[in-house]
Curated annotation (Swiss-Prot):
GO terms for cellular component: cytosolic large ribosomal subunit. PANTHER family: 39S RIBOSOMAL PROTEIN L18, MITOCHONDRIAL, LARGE RIBOSOMAL SUBUNIT PROTEIN UL18M. This is one of the proteins that bind and probably mediate the attachment of the 5S RNA into the large ribosomal subunit, where it forms part of the central protuberance. Belongs to the universal ribosomal protein uL18 family. This is Large ribosomal subunit protein uL18. It holds the Pfam family Ribosomal_L18p. InterPro entries: Ribosomal_uL18_bac-type (IPR004389), Ribosomal_uL18_bac/euk (IPR005484). Gene3D superfamilies: 3.30.420.100. The keyword Transferase does not apply. Part of the 50S ribosomal subunit; part of the 5S rRNA/L5/L18/L25 subcomplex. Contacts the 5S and 23S rRNAs.
Amino acid sequence: MDKKVARIRRATRARHLMREQGATRLVVHRTPRHIYAQVIAPNGSEVLAAASTVEKVIKEQVKYTGNKDAAAVVGKLVAERALAKGIQAVAFDRSGFKYHGRVQVLADAAREAGLQF
């Protein structure tokens, strides 16, 4: 089993538990150059809010899109968009990534912006 398969297995297990609980999820995906965050409905079929470093709005605010500063901007923006749609509480789905570095910074920024998890 390689590193990617192990991460996907961890993510699948966590998503199964969140789906059983019927929780709205804040899903994070990271690549070496970008980070993506989506708020997904409990049934898993609808994206309610999203933000990523691919967006022009965020690219204008940060110097480089693959660092912690960019992750903080994405976390704040996705939280603001979720709160604007009336979503206040979510379950944090880290997609099998370690809760460390950019993933942790994104989560902290979303919490500071008012999202509860």
